[in-house]
C-alpha cells in the first residue's frame, strides 16, 4: 500500500520474478515514496570465494539525522568467521567526514584479529582555503589480498595517508 500522507509504502509477500521464476521474496517491505532517506535493512549480499568460502552480509542503514548516517554491515565468512563492518558519514556546510571500517576478531585462517579503517575529512576554511586529509590503516600486509572488493585493490603495497591544504 502507498500512503502519500506519510510518504511511505509497504508491501506484503512481495517478490521479483524473472521469466515467471521468483528470484527475490520478502514477507514484508517498507520504503519511502520520495527522495527522503529511511532507516532499515538493505538487501543482503551473498557470495562465494575460494579465500573466504560462502559469504553473507546483512547491512542495516541508520538515518541518524539529515546530515549524518551510519551503515552497519556484519558479514559472515564460512572460512574466517564474523566480520563487523560499518560506514559513518557526516556533512555540514563547511565539513564532510567519512569513517569506514572492518574488524574480524580472531580470523579462523590466521588465528589473529584483522581489520581496516579508512578516515576521510574535508574542511572548508575561511578565505576559500580547504583542508583535506585521508588515512588508511590495515592490520597486516595480507589484508587487501584476502578482503579486497575488486582486483584493483589486491596489490596495494601500503595504506594511503595524506593531508593537503589548498586555496
What are these language model-derived features?
Residues 1-93, 98, 151-155, 159-167:
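Outer-membrane beta-barrel initiation region
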Residues 100-167:
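Flexible loop and strand-edge segments within Gram-negative outer membrane beta-barrel domains
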Amino acid at each position: 500500500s502507498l500512503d502519500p500522507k506519510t510518504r511511505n509504502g509497504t508491501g506484503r509477500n512481495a517478490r521479483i520474478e524473472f521469466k515467471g521464476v521468483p528470484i527475490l521474496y520478502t514477507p514484508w517491505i517498507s520504503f519511502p515514496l520520495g527522495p527522503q532517506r529511511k532507516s532499515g535493512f538493505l538487501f543482503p549480499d551473498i557470495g562465494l570465494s575460494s579465500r573466504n568460502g560462502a559469504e553473507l552480509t546483512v547491512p542495516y542503514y541508520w538515518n541518524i539525522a539529515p546530515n549524518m548516517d551510519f551503515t552497519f554491515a556484519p558479514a559472515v565468512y564460512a572460512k574466517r568467521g564474523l566480520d563487523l563492518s560499518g560506514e559513518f558519514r557526516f556533512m555540514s556546510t563547511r565539513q564532510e567526514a567519512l569513517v569506514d571500517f572492518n574488524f574480524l576478531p580472531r580470523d579462523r585462517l590466521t588465528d589473529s584479529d584483522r581489520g581496516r579503517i579508512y578516515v576521510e575529512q574535508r574542511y572548508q576554511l575561511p578565505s576559500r582555503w580547504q583542508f583535506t586529509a585521508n588515512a588508511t590503516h590495515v592490520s597486516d600486509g595480507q589484508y587487501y589480498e584476502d578482503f579486497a572488493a575488486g582486483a584493483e585493490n589486491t596489490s596495494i603495497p601500503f595504506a594511503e595517508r595524506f593531508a593537503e591544504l589548498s586555496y
